[in-house]
Each structure stands twice: as C-alpha cells, then as structure tokens.
C-alpha cells in the first residue's frame, strides 16, 4: 500500500472514504490460516497407508482441515514429518462450502500404552499409537464395535487395525479392510492395565488393604482396585458367606445330569444367549467327601467365587489385577507370565501336548484342547441336556449350549 495512502488515513478526521476502506479489505489476511494448516500434514495418510504399523496414530489428525488449503499441503508434506502430537482446531471461515469442517475437533495424542475394550483378554499393546478424538458427528454404520459417542473416546490406531480418520469427509471410519478378530479397539472397556500400568480407559490401578471378616476372625488382604468404578464389594468389609444362603445359585449341576424343573428356572430365559452363558458359566466341580465347604467369598464386586480358606482366596485376588503380560504377536494380555508363555505356543506352532492313545498321536498347543480331544477316545460326554425327556450328552460344554438354545427357542415359540 502506498505511503501517501497511509498518511491520508492517519490525518483524516472522523470518516473514512469508502474507497479507502475497500483498499484495506483488499489486503487479504489469510496468512495465519495457511500457516496453521501447513503445520498439519493433511495428505500424509497416503504415505502412512504404505506403512500401517507405524502411522496409524497420525490418521486421526488429517481429516479436520483437508479441504481448506489442500494444495499447500502438497508442497510441504514430502519435505518434513511433524511430531505425532497434533492439535487441530476448527477454522473460522465464511465459505459455506467449508461448513462441515466446523463439526469436529480432533486431538491426536501419542503414547505407547496397552489399549483395549470390551474383551479383557484381547487387550492390545502394539507399536501403534493411541488417538483421543472428540467427535460430535453421527456414529458410522457397521455394528456396535464401530460405535463412537460424542465424547472423548480412545481409539487404538494400531497397525493391524488401521483405525484412523477419513481425509476428506470429517468422519471417522475403520481402515484396513478386513476387521481383526479383536473387539478391543475402542477404549473404556473393562480390561485391566498393561504397559505402564494404565488401563485402556485411562484407568489407574492401586493396591488397597481390605479387612475380611470370617468366623475365624478378621484378617487383611491386599487387592487391586481401579478408579473407574468401585471394584471392592460391600465398601471395605466383606462378610463371610455361607453357600446356600446369600451366594448366587450354582447351576452347574444342570450341566451334568440334573433336570430342569417343569416350569424352568424362574428369572432365566435360556433362549437368550447371554443368560444361557451365565447359566452354564460355572464349571462343574467334583465334590469329594472330605471337601471342606467354601465359605469365603472374593471381595471383588461381581466375582462370585468362593474359597475354602484365606490362603486360597488370597491366591485368587491377583487375577483381578492389571494384565501386564502382553503377547507381542496378537496383543492378548494376561495377569500371569506363565499364562502368556502358554498362550505363545499358539503362535510358535509348538505342540507339546500329545494324545497317548494308540494309533492317534495328535498333538496340541494347549492342554485344554488335549483334554477335550481325549474324550473322543474315551467316549466321555460329561455335559448332559437338562431338559426333561432329552438325554443327549456332549463332550464339550459349547456343544451343549448350542443344543440348549434349540430347546429354549422351540419352547418360546409354542
């Protein structure tokens, strides 16, 4: 702008000619907008897609502002890589074609952490990153696993899941084509912690001393507790329970021969897979004559296990702690290192458990699978249909559950 124009404006009194105002508006002030945009590598997704194992965490930052100055990105993103910590805020613009970019704020926060969700045995701790995304856009179609609320959610952008943001639409979608078998890619689940002791839902774990009252007296135990919810039942004191009084009913006897009452079990709909799973949840236990009654309950809320003595209950308590032993191959997490070592046999192909029946010799990675296999030879079918008039038996509990569903659904249709 000419210096004479500047002096004219400064010396003018109260009013400014319209022509001069127009000259001021011609001086386009878009440099700050473009500067902000060039700090976000908007098209880096194309490079990251070629290396999904390391770039999943950057996907969440590319969607919010791709349409504002995409041609500027093209000149910059090949020359440098920004740190994965990106804060992308919606830009103020009068262009009606860019309104959809006002709908979201994407915060990408990178840290190495075990990430998980619904399936506590399927926690993931890969070399990928964790994105925290605030998204007030409608949840994408595709089932419960893809549902994203309008809140700050944790998305595991691990390489195998390929999770990230779409570069053009301001929406979040799952990438990577085929879905992984894990269900734990949205955080906030009930899983336990790993890595640095932090849970997928940013749950903080601590050990607490809890007083337990029994008929033999009081004693204290150390147990894990998280800040997400009250894991300890009955505040800090757990009274001893006597089986048959306050403890939940044990339905395992119906899985091993006892028939259901004519009217069924009140309050249980066996045609509902969830209720059926609860019905068949407890494994049948062989009762010995010298078996002492199990009178001491686990103090963790939601756990119904009972124990014969204090030491047995103490041994059990650590199973409610953080799952810090993580399989590098698939991301499953375990409380005990021995369980992780046993699980890793599945990936190594090692099969140390061999069937000893003559002429068989089949080998298995897990002892559980061998025990199930042996029933083929022995003819042992310990799982019996509980419906009156049906005497079918099964070698595996899963087969019995499927069979029970056919009875229950047929009964409901009558």
From Swiss-Prot:
Residue ranges of the region described as Binding to DNA: 295-414
Superkingdom of the organism of origin: Eukaryota
Modified positions (Phosphothreonine) in chain numbering: 378
Region of interest: Involved in nuclear matrix association: 257-341
Biased composition (Low complexity): 32-41
Region: Disordered, residue numbers: 32-83, 159-203
Reported phenotype of the disruption mutant: Spermatocytes have a significant decrease in the global level of the heterochromatin markers and increase in the chromosomal double-strand break (DSB) signals at the leptotene/zygotene stages.
Compositionally biased region (Acidic residues): 42-55
Distribution of this protein across tissues and organs: Expressed in ovary and, at lower levels, in testis.
ZnF start-end (C2H2-type): 296-320, 325-347, 353-377, 383-407
Residues the entry annotates as binding Zn(2+) 3: 355, 360, 373, 377
Functional summary from the UniProt entry: Multifunctional transcription factor that exhibits positive and negative control on a large number of cellular and viral genes by binding to sites overlapping the transcription start site. Binds to the consensus sequence 5'-CCGCCATNTT-3'; some genes have been shown to contain a longer binding motif allowing enhanced binding; the initial CG dinucleotide can be methylated greatly reducing the binding affinity.
The protein's assembly and partners: Interacts with YAF2 through the region encompassing the first and second zinc fingers. Component of the chromatin remodeling INO80 complex; specifically part of a complex module associated with the DBINO domain of INO80. Interacts with EED and EZH2; the interactions are indicative for an association with the PRC2/EED-EZH2 complex. Found in a complex with SMAD1 and SMAD4. Interacts with SFMBT2. Found in a complex with YY1, SIN3A and HDAC1.
Protein name: Transcriptional repressor protein YY1
